[in-house]
Amino acid sequence: AFDGITVACMAHELHKNLSGGRISKIAQPETDELLLTIKSQEGNFRLLLSASASLPLVYLTQTNKPSPLTAPNFCMLLRKHISGGRIIAVTQPSMERILRFEIEHLDEMGDQCRKFLIVELMGKYSNIIFCTPDDKIIDSIKHISAQISSVREVLPGRDYFIPQAAGKKDPLSSDEAVFKETLS
């Protein structure tokens, strides 16, 4: 399982390698998995994003995975919106086990716009969520209704938010005194 510090390192490494890169291919080889092919100045990369309950992962790979002949709806939606899009940034909000990919693309009218692909690496609660800049959910790889979760719904049209973590502190941005106080 990933922790916030590991995800911070991943965000830094992915940002370094993928920022400015264009998404040339989007595949969904498994029901809870995406494989993005990205062409950047650093080279060509395959980025695997998995929201598997048993093994959520994000990693760069050289391996290509076979995809179904008919792409699932979530994959088709991503292709429509962000295929050919440019990755602006890969960030981690507030030491959470979340990676946020900011993607700039052209809409149907040829206007530049931004979208966010958010990967939550939280064990059985892992998900991949596609959002607008004002945090409206366009769609997600797993739909979570009010019957499934009393904390939040992850459905198209709903607001995206990160459930509040009680009293979490960011060890990477704390000064020495706060860090020592937290440990004692």
Q: What do these predicted regions represent?
A:
Residues A1-Y59:
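Extreme N-terminal "head/tail" segments of very large remodeling/mechanoenzyme assemblies
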Residues F2, Q41-S184:
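Phosphate/anion-contacting hairpin/loop surfaces
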